[in-house]
Structures are given as structure tokens and as C-alpha cells.
Regions:
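Conserved, mostly hydrophobic/aromatic
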Residues: 28, 32, 39, 78
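Hydrophobic faces of well-ordered beta-strands that scaffold small-molecule active sites
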Residues: 26-30, 47-49, 84
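Glycine-rich, proline-tolerant flexible connector loops at the mouths of alpha/beta enzymes
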Residues: 35-36, 42, 46-72
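Alpha-helix-loop-beta-strand connector modules within alpha/beta enzyme cores
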Residues: 10-12, 60-85
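N-terminal amphipathic alpha-helix/helix-capping segment at the start of soluble metabolic enzymes
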Residues: 1-29
Length: 85
């Protein structure tokens, strides 16, 4: 796994460079600030926020009911817990 530095901002170019070098990196899913903060402290380089929150958080049978407003809300939550976002 790539060595991460706490609070270091990474970009798409960072991941392209890691892929080109054959280095691995960690990616996990979060929908809220507390977990995002723990992931940041643990050195997770990529935090995913996706429409799966419809099934995981909202209790829907599919991701279809998830709106862009829902995604943006959870992105703000994750960002508030991640000092490097």
C-alpha cells in the first residue's frame, strides 16, 4: 500500500501515478463524518461516497431513489470529518 501522510491532499493524478508505479492504495466507503475522520487518521487514501447509501443508510431496496441532493449531503458529511478533503 502506498505510504500516506496524514492530511496530505491527493488528486486523480496521485492515483494515476500510484497505478503506473504498480503501488496499491486503500479505498473504503463512508457516508458520515465520524467514520471519515477515522479513515483519515488510519491513512486511507480514497473514501468513496456513492448511491449505495440508498440501501445501506436509507433502507431502500435499490439505489434508484437516491437523489443528487442525497449524495451531496453525504459528501459534505464525509468532507467535514476528513481534514485532507
Amino acid at each position: 500500500m502506498a505510504k500516506s501522510q496524514s492530511n496530505k491532499i491527493v488528486s486523480l493524478q496521485t492515483f494515476r501515478d500510484l497505478k503506473q508505479k504498480g503501488e496499491k492504495f486503500a479505498a473504503l466507503t463512508s457516508y458520515e463524518a465520524t467514520l471519515s475522520s477515522m479513515m483519515c487518521d488510519a491513512g486511507i487514501e480514497l473514501i468513496l461516497v456513492g448511491d449505495s447509501l440508498g440501501m445501506v443508510i436509507q433502507g431502500h431496496d435499490s439505489t434508484v431513489p437516491v437523489s443528487m441532493e442525497d449524495i451531496l449531503y453525504h459528501l459534505r458529511c464525509v468532507k467535514s470529518g476528513n481534514k485532507g478533503a
